[in-house]
């Protein structure tokens, strides 16, 4: 099962559509972790399951979603309500409450993934305003039995190989 994860697009429309179209045949689910700054029913967001970010004032998005991908549960949140810039423990505890195996969030605009106490945490970075790295990014999560692979891509669809992460869940 493949999941496309994107966040912090801050008003970009064409780019969201281009990325969705590029991967539509290979992914089973598309997630936007907030700060789209678009209306809830905007055509660019149509293929995505979207949560509300701290810059989303125009839509009635939910603060979090609990999605199922195969046998795994994915908590999707922007991260600002959990203070992810200070600690990942708050969002970890929320995932624990909900029984989620994977946590997808944005807010910091910093791409990366790691396992914290058995939960895979993924921040796809930002396709508009990346921080730390200068490359705009999004991610694709591949779930296979007890393994997960997270691959990151730049806006043009080129893999950012040094961010790839393969873990056991």
Swiss-Prot record:
<keyword id="KW-0464">Manganese</keyword>
<dbReference type="GO" id="GO:0046872">
    <property type="term" value="F:metal ion binding"/>
</dbReference>
<dbReference type="InterPro" id="IPR041802">
    <property type="entry name" value="MPP_YfcE"/>
</dbReference>
<feature type="binding site">
    <location>
        <position position="54"/>
    </location>
    <ligand>
        <name>Mn(2+) 2</name>
    </ligand>
</feature>
<feature type="binding site">
    <location>
        <position position="109"/>
    </location>
    <ligand>
        <name>Mn(2+) 1</name>
    </ligand>
</feature>
<comment type="similarity">
    <text>Belongs to the metallophosphoesterase superfamily. YfcE family.</text>
</comment>
<dbReference type="InterPro" id="IPR020935">
    <property type="entry name" value="PdiEstase_YfcE_CS"/>
</dbReference>
<feature type="binding site">
    <location>
        <position position="8"/>
    </location>
    <ligand>
        <name>Mn(2+) 1</name>
    </ligand>
</feature>
<keyword id="KW-0479">Metal-binding</keyword>
<dbReference type="InterPro" id="IPR024654">
    <property type="entry name" value="Calcineurin-like_PHP_lpxH"/>
</dbReference>
<dbReference type="Pfam" id="PF12850">
    <property type="entry name" value="Metallophos_2"/>
</dbReference>
<dbReference type="InterPro" id="IPR000979">
    <property type="entry name" value="Phosphodiesterase_MJ0936/Vps29"/>
</dbReference>
<keyword id="KW-0378">Hydrolase</keyword>
<feature type="binding site">
    <location>
        <position position="35"/>
    </location>
    <ligand>
        <name>Mn(2+) 2</name>
    </ligand>
</feature>
<feature type="binding site">
    <location>
        <position position="78"/>
    </location>
    <ligand>
        <name>Mn(2+) 2</name>
    </ligand>
</feature>
<feature type="binding site">
    <location>
        <position position="107"/>
    </location>
    <ligand>
        <name>Mn(2+) 2</name>
    </ligand>
</feature>
<dbReference type="GO" id="GO:0016787">
    <property type="term" value="F:hydrolase activity"/>
</dbReference>
<feature type="binding site">
    <location>
        <position position="35"/>
    </location>
    <ligand>
        <name>Mn(2+) 1</name>
    </ligand>
</feature>
<dbReference type="InterPro" id="IPR029052">
    <property type="entry name" value="Metallo-depent_PP-like"/>
</dbReference>
<feature type="binding site">
    <location>
        <position position="10"/>
    </location>
    <ligand>
        <name>Mn(2+) 1</name>
    </ligand>
</feature>
<protein>
    <recommendedName>
        <fullName>Probable metallophosphoesterase YsnB</fullName>
        <ecNumber>3.1.4.-</ecNumber>
    </recommendedName>
</protein>
């Amino acid at each position: 099962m493949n999941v496309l994860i994107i966040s912090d697009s801050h008003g970009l429309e064409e780019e969201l559509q281009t990325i969705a179209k590029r991967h539509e045949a290979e992914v089973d689910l598309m997630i936007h972790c907030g700060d789209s700054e678009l209306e809830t029913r905007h055509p660019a967001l149509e293929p995505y399951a979207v949560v509300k970010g701290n810059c989303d004032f125009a839509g009635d998005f939910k603060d979090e979603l609990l999605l199922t991908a195969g046998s795994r549960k994915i908590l999707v949140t922007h991260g600002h309500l959990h203070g992810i810039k200070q600690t990942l423990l708050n969002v970890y505890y929320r995932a624990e409450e909900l029984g989620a195996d994977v946590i997808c969030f944005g807010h910091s605009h910093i791409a990366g993934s790691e396992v914290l106490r058995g939960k895979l945490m993924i921040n796809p970075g930002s396709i508009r305003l990346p921080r730390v790295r200068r490359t705009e990014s999004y991610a694709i999560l591949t779930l296979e039995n007890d393994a997960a692979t997270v691959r990151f891509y730049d806006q043009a669809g080129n893999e950012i190989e040094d961010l790839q992460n393969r873990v056991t869940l």
